[in-house]
UniProtKB/Swiss-Prot annotation:
Sequence similarity: Belongs to the class I-like SAM-binding methyltransferase superfamily. RNA M5U methyltransferase family. RlmC subfamily.
Residues annotated to bind [4Fe-4S] cluster: C3, C11, C14, C87
One GO molecular-function entry: rRNA (uridine-C5-)-methyltransferase activity
SUPFAM superfamilies: S-adenosyl-L-methionine-dependent methyltransferases
A UniProt-annotated Pfam family: tRNA_U5-meth_tr
Gene: rlmC
Record-linked PANTHER family: RNA M5U METHYLTRANSFERASE, TRNA (URACIL(54)-C(5))-METHYLTRANSFERASE
Identification of the protein by name: 23S rRNA (uracil(747)-C(5))-methyltransferase RlmC
């Protein structure tokens, strides 16, 4: 993939952009193989990867420049602001909308937040795209409430031009710190969630809920998880760090009981909506800390299968110990950090590594997703 920003050393996020996708994936596979070399892996599945461009469904744009000439993008290594509205990771329609949002900020006259001077209002514009319908969730991250009226003044024209923008919100982030969002979220549209669908599972996205950024690979990841779990025919499932429920909802059946645990209340709201839409009645999604939940359960609550999809820090020693004690017949671990994955696998006692498969969720970078099936020792 060609990128002028990379050639000019303005943006270095896609550090492996000059390598063909198969070469990138081979290098990632080698890293994973080395990290898991201490484990006896019964089956290495072929890695899964997708297109090199137009795949990303979320843009996190720093708002730079001035009110009369705003720039949505990043600060270069040399300190210059550069627009990334034409980033090839985004679909063409998303690039076009990002350019229109630069114009929107100028028309609204909202001063970008200046970190050095601690002045200005608009910090970030966050844009999420639903691949099923090409609809959008748009968020403005502001320092205060001062500029909300300016956004509301220009919003009707924007929505008339882009009716596919279904959800618009303002997030208030008042502190002078490198924090993406604050606690307060104000909706400027009647709709408060974006509809999405992976495979046959309806999913919903709210402003603060985590969602995978590569829909094509995420759908394949969820489908693979479904197939692996189906082989076990579980009656009870736990989905820890469940987010909006993608893994659990793919793996549950109308006969099985699913418990989903996630710290984000917004994500749990979305998961409940999905379960209702699917007609699943033996489902319990709850906003709790996953480690605390597991530690508070009794042995009689032991599930047949536990699914974990933690953040980059992994599940940690305490949860590893809890899972080892519960001894479900299988643990399905989806990881975005192979280093913490290897550490956790070494901590979980009494299991063998049945299957491992790499999913290249983050092309042109060193990052990737890994799906691992652990089976209880006989």
């Amino acid at each position: 993939m060609k990128c002028a920003h990379f050639v000019q050393q303005q943006c270095l996020s896609c550090r492996h952009i000059n390598q063909p996708m198969p070469v990138q994936v081979a290098a990632k596979s080698q890293v994973l193989s080395q990290l898991l070399s201490g484990f006896e892996v019964e089956q290495w599945r072929e890695p899964v990867f997708g297109p090199e461009s137009g795949f990303r469904n979320k843009a996190k744009m720093v708002v730079l420049g001035a009110a009369h000439q705003p720039i949505l993008g990043i600060v270069t290594p040399t300190g210059e602001p550069v627009s990334l509205c034409d980033c090839n990771l985004y679909p063409i329609d998303m690039q076009q909308l990002l350019h229109r949002l630069e114009l929107f900020v100028r028309q609204a006259g909202i001063p970008p937040y200046n970190v050095d001077k601690v002045k200005g209002e608009l910090k970030f514009i966050l844009l999420t795209r639903s691949q099923i319908k090409g609809e959008y969730l748009l968020r403005f991250v502001l320092r205060s409430h001062k500029s909300i009226e300016r956004i509301e003044r220009e919003l009707p024209q924007l929505l008339s031009e882009y009716p596919q923008i279904k959800v618009v919100s303002v997030n208030i982030q008042p502190v002078h710190m490198a924090i993406l969002e604050g606690e307060e979220e104000l909706f400027l549209t009647e709709e408060t969630r974006l509809s999405e669908q992976f495979n046959d599972v309806p999913l919903f996205i709210r402003p603060k809920s985590f969602f995978q950024t590569h829909p094509e690979i995420a759908a394949k990841l969820y489908q693979t998880a479904r197939e692996w779990v189906a082989e076990l025919k579980p009656d009870t499932l736990w989905d820890l760090f469940c987010g909006v429920g993608g893994f659990g909802l793919h793996c549950a059946s109308k006969q099985s009981a699913l418990t989903g645990i996630e710290i984000s209340a917004e994500a749990i709201t979305c998961a409940k909506l999905s379960a209702e839409a699917m007609g699943l009645t033996q489902v319990n999604f709850t906003a709790l800390d996953s480690t605390g939940f597991a530690q508070g359960c009794d042995a009689k609550d032991k599930p047949d299968v536990v699914i974990v999809n933690p953040p980059r820090r992994g599940i940690g020693e305490s949860l590893c110990q809890s899972l080892s004690a519960f001894a479900p017949k299988a643990i399905l671990y989806s990881s975005c950090n192979p280093h913490t994955l290897a550490k956790d696998l070494a901590c979980i006692q009494g299991y063998r590594v049945q299957k491992v498969q790499l999913f290249d969720m983050f092309p042109h970078t060193d990052h990737f997703e890994v799906l691992v099936m652990l089976l209880k020792d006989a």
